Design a protein with these regions (language model features):
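Gly/Thr-rich phosphate-binding loop signature of adenosyl cofactor/nucleotide-binding cores
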Residues: 651-653
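A short linear hydrophobic-aromatic micro-motif
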Residues: 54-58
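Extracellular beta-sheet/turn segments enriched in Thr/Pro/Gly and aliphatic residues
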Residues: 1-10
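Active-site-adjacent helical/loop segments in soluble small-molecule enzymes
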Residues: 49
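Strand-loop-strand
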Residues: 628-629, 637
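Outer-membrane beta-barrel proteins, especially TonB-dependent receptors
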Residues: 5-6, 15-32, 36-40, 59-67, ...
């Protein structure tokens, strides 16, 4: 949320030119602190940050979420974890982010293409997942976290142990999470919504005066069942896939996702600045089982090698410079009976240089330029439904840039301005898809002739801070040439290659197309704190996404988030320092108190009706508005002035409202013949209990 903006301004942002104070960043940035992450009830890390202004999630059930920033997602958002870009075949609706949420300490969200460090796919922005920082010299700590959610019986635990002895640092953790089917007022328990998640992480390294060198190994396993949404034609009830809808075991059909990551992170301190080099290897194995739990129909195996070399200078005469090169090599293959995309190889690289300049006490200027090149080659494997060859080769390249300024008008007002040019090469799914997606309930067809996307985005922000009120306004205008999107192409007609495939007769067919688009929107927030212990925070997000020069029914871009207003009244019942401040100063009274950092909060999330839809060929439908009431509380338990546990309680959808989010893929499942309602609804009332036990060794 937007509260306590003055203290938040002192935080350091890493996703721009080196490490920069938030108050000096010209582009829009949101930061999610460790305390907010721990206190937020969620099923995955993207779900946890989806409450941030301008951020949404595309969901398939309770376990799969994809980040959407200002109406843009998929390969337009780069997710960074362990210092490398997360590569998990993110082109699919039902392909989430393969990162253990318990391993994430804080999150940076960069909105728009202003940061030049991340390349082609960062047109919409970047989500940077920061893991726990290394401990100070001589420290050893452990951490035990346990969580339970009532709606889907989610049970999770997380074990972590870390230390720093004579500069040798380590951090080991293991997480396990399981959930049975979730329920709502209209559908009851939803068959196929159960999942199981396991993850492990090990970091070994050295921290010295010359810098650091760390090796990280991470593994992530997710087994979500697939919600098909099929109904009994007589009763309208969802057809159960097993006799026990509260089982934690998998049921057909289901996915099995395994993601492995090895990262070597190095930083060398120099007299003039520092040099950073990160090399990463990832393997993503994604299987779908439809008829038998022992025989997969689809099996994608993706190998990714990433590299990043960066040099950042110390500040001199108000200047700070950064330059670098980075890129990746990918090899993807199909090992299943069914194909969605052809085998392919990809190689890309990018060169960039950025600069910031402090002008007096009021102005901070920054700018930069980047060049990207990408080569992609698809190999023969199957015949494409639209008659195109399934083997092709494409090359893409472009220059991009950004320029911005921050003006500290006075002690109360801060003005931010930024203009950025973005670029994105079409991904392999957009160019070469030809198959049914069991998890997204459709058949998809690519177009190898698609052009790259180019964007021009302008941002204007104004921050106000006073003793009792803080407010922020962020405006943006984004023009995208050759915007790529999916649209429904109707029933099968012989010779056209579109509609219903003979190989998937029950699946509607969607084809990739493109057109020029413009997106306008804003995020606004205000926090009232008439007394120190009370905060009334409000945030509103809006984006209008239109296709230019389009016919009626195709005017609006498909799957644009609905306008969202979030409000929270929070009462802090005991003294504490703000969670984002590194050093906590505790009073004698706080040392004597059994409960510290005690708070109670009431929240309301209102999503307005989304009537701006791509209605041609029933690509999408309007979504009614709804409001969700929540209640939360939390506290630290202290004994003899030492924190021994943290407790969190959250009740989401307190009134058990039946609703469908506009970005839920389950909204387009089968219609209930009895009620006339289409699709599967989101989760009903859900109460979460979480306990965190820190242990100092």
């Amino acid at each position: 949320m937007f509260y306590r903006h003055l203290q938040l301004n002192e935080l350091t942002v890493t996703g721009v030119t080196g490490d920069t104070k938030l108050k000096h960043v010209t582009a829009p940035v949101s930061i999610v602190s460790p305390q907010v992450l721990r206190a937020t009830a969620s099923t995955n890390v993207i779900d946890a940050i989806s409450h941030q202004p301008g951020v949404s999630q595309l969901t398939t059930g309770g376990s799969i979420s994809k980040p959407i920033i200002r109406g843009l997602g998929y390969n337009r958002v780069v997710v960074m974890s362990e210092g490398v870009r997360q590569e998990g075949q993110q082109w699919g609706d039902e392909h989430g982010v393969e990162v253990d949420g318990n391993s994430v300490n804080s999150v940076e969200i960069l909105k728009g293409p202003a940061s030049l460090m991340y390349g082609s796919d960062a047109m919409a922005g970047v989500v940077i997942l920061h893991q726990q920082p290394t401990l100070a010299e001589g420290e050893m700590k452990a951490n035990v976290t346990s969580e339970y959610q009532t709606n889907n019986g989610l049970f999770a635990y997380h074990l972590q142990m870390a230390g720093n002895q004579n500069g040798f640092v380590w951090d080991a953790s293991f997480s396990d999470k399981m959930a049975h089917a979730y329920k709502n007022k209209y559908d009851g328990y939803v068959p196929g919504s159960q999942f199981r998640e396991r993850a492990g992480r090990l970091m070994l390294g050295v921290n010295k005066g010359w810098g650091h060198s760390r090796l990280v190994w991470a593994i992530y396993h997710l087994t979500p069942s697939i919600i098909e949404g099929e109904r009994d034609p007589k009763t309208g009830e969802l057809e159960p896939l097993s006799n026990d809808l509260k089982t934690y075991g998998r049921s057909l059909p289901f996915q099995q996702v395994k993601h492995y990551k090895l990262v070597w992170d190095n930083s060398l301190n120099l007299s003039s600045g520092y040099l950073k080099a990160i090399i990463g290897y990832q393997q993503n194995r994604r299987q779908e089982f439809e008829e038998s739990p022992d025989e997969y129909e689809t099996f994608f195996k993706l190998h990714t090698l990433t590299y990043d070399l960066r040099y950042v200078t110390n500040e001199f005469d108000g200047w700070k410079l950064s330059t670098g090169i980075g890129g990746m090599y990918q090899k993807s293959g199909n090992e299943g009976e069914e194909y969605l995309i052809p085998d392919y190889r990809l190689f890309d690289f990018g060169l960039y240089a950025t600069a910031t300049k402090q002008l007096g006490d009021r102005w901070m200027l920054n700018g930069g330029v980047r060049y990207d090149h990408r080569h992609l080659k698809a190999f023969p494997g199957f015949s494409m439904l639209n008659g195109q060859e399934d083997n092709f080769s494409r090359n893409f390249g472009a220059f991009t840039g950004s320029v911005g300024a921050v003006c500290n008008i006075n002690e109360h007002f801060n003005l931010r301005m930024n203009l950025a040019r973005g670029f994105r090469a079409p991904n392999l799914s957009e160019l070469g898809s030809n198959g049914k997606h069991e998890g997204s309930l459709r058949y998809e067809i690519g177009d190898k002739g698609l052009k790259p996307e180019y964007s021009l985005q302008a941002d204007l922000g104004l921050d106000f801070t006073s003793r009792y009120v803080s407010a922020q306004l962020a405006l943006f205008a984004n023009r995208i040439d050759n915007y790529v999107f999916l649209h429904h192409v109707g029933d099968y007609t012989e010779g056209t290659g579109y509609g219903y495939s003979v190989y998937a007769p029950t699946y509607p067919v969607y084809a990739y197309t493109q057109g020029d688009a413009r997106l306008l929107g804003f995020e606004a927030g205000v926090d009232f704190h008439p007394i120190h212990s009370v905060h009334f925070s409000n945030a509103f997000s809006y984006v209008d996404a239109q296709q230019m020069h389009a016919a009626p029914g195709t005017k609006y871009l498909p799957f644009t988030p609905a306008p969202k207003w979030s409000s929270e009244l929070k009462w802090e019942l005991s003294h504490h320092s703000h969670p984002t401040i590194a050093h906590h100063h505790t009073t004698d009274a706080a040392h004597r108190s059994l409960l510290n950092n005690l708070y109670v909060a009431v929240g309301l999330d209102c999503l307005l009706k989304q009537s701006h839809i791509y209605g041609a060929d029933d690509t999408e439908t309007e979504t009614p508005g709804y409001a969700l009431l929540s209640l939360s509380a939390g506290t630290d338990l202290q004994l003899h002035g030492k924190k021994v546990a943290e407790f969190y309680f959250t009740a989401d959808n307190l009134l058990d409202k039946a609703y469908q989010n506009h970005l839920s893929r389950l909204k387009y499942a089968d219609e209930n013949a009895v009620t006339g309602r289409r699709g599967v609804y989101n989760m009903g009332r859900n109460i979460t209990f979480k306990v965190v036990i820190p242990i100092t060794l």
